[in-house]
A protein has these predicted regions:
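N-terminal active-site segment of His-dependent metallophosphoesterases
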Residues: 1-64, 138
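Binuclear metal-dependent phosphoesterase catalytic core
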Residues: 24, 32, 175, 197-246
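Active-site-proximal beta-strand elements of phosphoester/diester hydrolases
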Residues: 3-16, 112-121, 145-147, 202-207, ...
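Active-site environment of divalent metal-dependent phosphoester hydrolases
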Residues: 15-18, 54-57, 82-89, 123-125, ...
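Acidic/histidine-rich helix-loop elements
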Residues: 10-28, 54-56, 85-101, 160-161, ...
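Extended active-site neighborhood of metal-dependent phosphoesterases/phosphodiesterases
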Residues: 60-138, 168-181, 207, 211, ...
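Divalent metal-coordination and catalytic microenvironments
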Residues: 11, 46, 51, 65, ...
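His/acidic metal-ligating clusters that form di-metal
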Residues: 33-46, 114, 124-202, 238-240
Length: 246
């Protein structure tokens, strides 16, 4: 494989069948996004970046999400968000062997680099996961990508920064500061698009497929029902990425 074309989708917040989320048909949004990804014609990996469901979704919700992904015939990976249960995701998506200390942790090894999929579902990033990333990066000249639900930075979204930011952000930043070959850190959680520099890393926050929120509000106040997904093109030396809105 000369290059990887990734579709990053995050913050779906899928509810039970025929249920709307704040008046929004989140299932239809997800189906619409997948249709656009299929029509793109170049995507060879989909990454779901967490908050697949809303408030510990049922297995039925997760099975529906899985069925939609399976229909694309595109390879996919999933990571949990704070609204998800890692245990349920592991069961439904056959990831039991990727559980470690109650959290999901796995990676893809490519000819030109490695992708780590991290678990911040409890609000923090387990330090044993980050220690493994640090060790792997320190032993290789290859480049790496990280996918995690919570950004390791503040995102200038008032509600999220004040109430729902990564709990052990300072510890995580301290370790990331000493790693030089992470080419991109891709996150969700903030229901907004952001690109933020952290030391020598670029942290890229992908907008939600549910809705975007007012970045000045103290409550969850929808500012836009426009949904988006991120396309990432990576070959181990160069990386390009942009968000597509629907």
């Amino acid at each position: 494989m000369s290059s990887l074309h990734i579709a990053h989708i995050t913050d779906l917040h899928i509810l039970e069948e025929n249920q709307l989320n704040l008046g929004i048909d989140v299932r239809e949004n997800f189906i619409k996004i997948l249709k656009y990804i299929k029509a793109d014609g170049t995507i060879n990996k989909i990454v779901l970046g967490g908050d697949l469901g809303h408030d510990d979704p049922s297995e039925e919700v997760l099975l529906w999400i899985k069925s939609q992904l399976d229909q694309t015939k595109i390879d996919y990976r999933i990571i949990p968000g704070n609204h998800d249960s890692s245990q349920k995701l592991a069961k439904v998506f056959n990831l039991e062997t990727e559980m470690e200390e109650g959290r999901l942790f796995f990676w893809d090894e490519l000819d030109f680099g490695k992708i780590f999929y991290l678990d911040t579902s409890n609000g923090d990033l387990p330090m044993h996961q980050l220690a493994w990333v640090e060790e792997e990066c320190g032993q290789s000249y290859q480049k790496f990508l990280l996918f995690m639900h919570h950004p390791p930075v503040l995102g200038n979204v008032h509600l999220m920064d004040e109430n729902h930011a990564l709990e052990n952000m300072n510890q995580v930043q301290k370790i990331l500061r000493n790693i030089n070959n992470i080419q991109g850190i891709f996150c969700g959680h903030y229901h907004n698009e952001r690109t933020i520099r952290l030391y020598n890393h670029m942290v890229m926050i992908t907008p939600s497929t549910f809705a975007q929120i007012d970045d000045q509000s103290e409550i969850f106040n929808i500012s836009s029902k426009t949904i988006g997904w991120r396309k990432i093109i990576w070959d181990g030396s160069s990386l390009s990425t942009y968000v597509k809105y629907l």
